[in-house]
Design a protein with these regions (language model features):
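Charge-rich, low-complexity N-terminal segments
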Residues: 1-54, 60-117
Length: 117
């Protein structure tokens, strides 16, 4: 009798992170669209860590006052996670942390440097 193989979970973290990113984006759109600070936030990536216990959500904001945006996201994280638990089909809902993604700013600085060469 052949041995039963374990399912390949190598991409499970990516699937969970992607699902969390999609759901949190929906939650921000549905619940905070009239919030002046959060209405300009776009989630651009997610990474799961610690056996899927933590998900880092990377965001970009049109608002130039990133510390204010980060403070506002930190303030709503608990309510977002509560809403996330209601929308996810999982026994455990990961902790979430928002981090600013400065990739666009770095890319524009590199472009400016290359133009000056």
């Amino acid at each position: 009798m052949p041995r039963k193989q374990m399912p390949n979970n190598s991409n499970r973290a990516g699937r969970v992170a992607s699902k969390v990113q999609t759901l949190v984006a929906e939650i921000l759109r549905d619940n905070y669209s009239d919030d002046k600070i959060l209405s300009g936030v776009s989630l651009v990536g997610a990474v799961a860590h610690g056996g899927l216990q933590f998900v880092r959500l990377f965001y970009y904001s049109r608002d130039e006052n990133i510390p204010a945006v980060q403070h506002r996201l930190d303030a709503v994280t608990r309510m977002v996670r509560f809403e996330l638990a209601a929308r996810m089909n999982q026994k455990y809902v990961p902790e979430i942390k928002f981090e600013y993604d400065d990739t666009l700013e770095r890319a524009s600085r590199i472009d400016a440097l290359l133009e000056n060469l």
